[in-house]
Amino acid sequence: MSKIVKVLGREIIDSRGNPTVEAEVHLEGGFVGMAAAPSGASTGSREALELRDGDKSRFLGKGVLKALAAVNGPIADALVGKDAKDQATIDQIMIDLDGTENKSNFGANAILAVSLANAKAAAAAKGMPLYEHIAELNGTPGVFSMPLPMMNIINGGEHADNNVDIQEFMIQPVGAKTLKEAVRMGAEVFHNLAKVLKSKGYNTAVGDEGGFAPNLKSNAEALEVIAEAVAAAGYKLGTDITLAMDCAASEFYDAEKKEYNLKGEGRIFTSNGFSDFLEELTEKFPIVSIEDGLDESDWEGFAYQTEKLGKKIQIVGDDLFVTNTKILKRGIDNGIANSILIKFNQIGSLTETLAAIKMAKDAGYTAVISHRSGETEDATIADLAVGTAAGQIKTGSMSRSDRVAKYNQLIRIEEALGSRAPFNGLKEVKGQA
């Protein structure tokens, strides 16, 4: 009953008003899976390729008709008749057909949408929720946990039209006992942050990921206003709520001068100097996780940063590792960072995503499941986080339904699993157990 009878793709719109690929996989017995590919703004140079048409007369060149042609043509032809339950084979067929290292022939957006739709169809055929099917594919059947959210409540960098250089300032509701309580705490801090910003005369428009995007005097001020909001919500910073940052430092790195330029506050740093600056912030605020704290190619600098901060906090590689096992292995072998950010579309298939999570966990690294800044209502990452017991998730703030869809799916899953999916809070963060 899990034989594929039809594969089709369509062009839909993401949260930034750009087209993306949505795929459907139909099986015998009437089972259907549907999934959409997300899209990033600050992308790592080694990510799998997102195929765009480049035809300026349609969607300003961002159309995905070429990727759709791959889904509806060679991919569909190759997958019809195959068993959807054999995810690794389905993914390998598409990877081999594409024939490139970075999926540039069909596009990672085409392959990923079909890969995820296939997993959903197989779960339906097995009569089980997606998270349960993912746990089986992961070789960890019946092992679940609810992830600690990193909620991006102030947006800067490439995710906002403001003067804040650091891309994400996040809160983690570590004092919560359940995912549902964590969501409530996050929402309360978010609403109090709006009041704090308004009281200071700051704008409360939101960025791509639903966080506020004000012009601030400095990056440190972002942490200061969040601290005020936490207190106003009746919570204790460092006990109930901890902080995390995504610097996305590649976006303000000058490769020629080998300098990190925080234009918003008029400061320029060397590689080690920027790591020292981050260390100062961790001494002033309870920051327990820093992502992409240096440029993706600054491996020497990351070695220094990991040595300096890695015993105390979580050092997450996003653009650094791009969910790629070959690059992650190099990081593990050289003691670079201690955590990986997991984004489906950086690598382009579910099977390869699961391999990256496994490699990280086997090496004692944590894995943080993540959305992209361009999202849809597709909430597959919620099931991925629970089904792999990853322990942490980044899926934006408490506004924009493209973000909230993931939190709502997590609430539903927690309700269904009950005590089978513990919420471990701060213990999930590297260096905090």
Curated annotation (Swiss-Prot):
**What's a BP term from Gene Ontology annotated to this protein?**
glycolytic process
**Where is the catalytic site?**
E209, K343
- What GO molecular functions are on record for this protein? magnesium ion binding; phosphopyruvate hydratase activity
Query: What is one term from the GO cellular component aspect held by the record?
Result: phosphopyruvate hydratase complex
- Top-rank EC class of the record's enzyme: lyase
> Which Enzyme Commission number(s) are listed?
4.2.1.11
Listed under catalytic activity are:
(2R)-2-phosphoglycerate = phosphoenolpyruvate + H2O
Cofactor-binding details, from the entry: Binds a second Mg(2+) ion via substrate during catalysis.
Question: What Pfam families does its record include?
Answer: Enolase_C, Enolase_N
Cross-referenced InterPro entries = Enolase (IPR000941), Enolase-like_C_sf (IPR036849), Enolase-like_N (IPR029017), Enolase_C (IPR020810), Enolase_CS (IPR020809), Enolase_N (IPR020811)
Cofactor(s) it depends on: Mg(2+)
So where does this one cross the membrane?
none
Quick one: which pathway? Carbohydrate degradation; glycolysis; pyruvate from D-glyceraldehyde 3-phosphate: step 4/5
Keyword annotations for this protein, in alphabetical order, are: Cytoplasm, Glycolysis, Lyase, Magnesium, Metal-binding, Secreted
Q: Which compartments is it annotated to reside in?
A: Cytoplasm; Secreted; Cell surface
Q: Where does (2R)-2-phosphoglycerate bind?
A: Q167, K343, R372, S373, K394
The entry assigns this protein to a family as follows: Belongs to the enolase family.
Show the HAMAP family listed in the entry. Enolase (MF_00318)
Report quaternary structure and partners.
Component of the RNA degradosome, a multiprotein complex involved in RNA processing and mRNA degradation.
Q: What does this protein do?
A: Catalyzes the reversible conversion of 2-phosphoglycerate (2-PG) into phosphoenolpyruvate (PEP). It is essential for the degradation of carbohydrates via glycolysis.
**Name of the protein described by the UniProt record:** Enolase
